[in-house]
């Protein structure tokens, strides 16, 4: 069975919790229900697919149909399951909010691991014609917080209905300094996927707001990548700038460091605030923040970072 709601409030479907409405909301449980709805109902376009709603900011009422599958498995539950089985590859993804489907679309990642490192293939339904097909890891064309599912021609059209995983790691992924410190603290001989997962979760909990207490969309900005020449200019003024050299020679600079050094940790606009413990996150501090509050704070952050560092920040959160 499916449920179709008209002109409804969907703030509860997002982790930000700012006011949000849509012309239609379609909720269903299995693929047969979805097929029935697509055949029987006249659904206003455009279409928007929501997983766990953890990477969205509704800036105005959505005039189309929001698709929301009920009972989606959370990414963290999958991480816990694999870690309990002693399988390496998911431990660094522990604690990331949202569904496995949304995480794949976004190529969610943390501490040196991304969804591209664990996804084998995905099953997809084309909402335009009902066709079903399979995309391999390569077909997904994963990039930094990006995938083939986010392209203008596929977003809102291709719906992931199932995912299979094939983690490739044979041990802990230690490209991130924090993970290396975790392995050192517990000892290589005691390093199990579950032990690392618990440390990763504790680290996240120490810096990030609890989703059931404070609304947010997780990391609000992408970590900018700049050229070696631009990074040399940055080092002239800020020799302590943290950085990560990418495979193509570009330099990734942590957005959290830029925001912090711009003096914006804890900054507020209306009910929106830069999270004091992790400036990469914007939170609904009062529980009554509006999209206008968040956008005003976003503009302020972008302007001040650009002025101080000559670096343009790009939001990671999808603006609707």
What residue ranges belong to the model's regions?
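Anion-binding (especially nucleotide phosphate/pyrophosphate-binding) glycine-rich loop
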Residues: 1-128
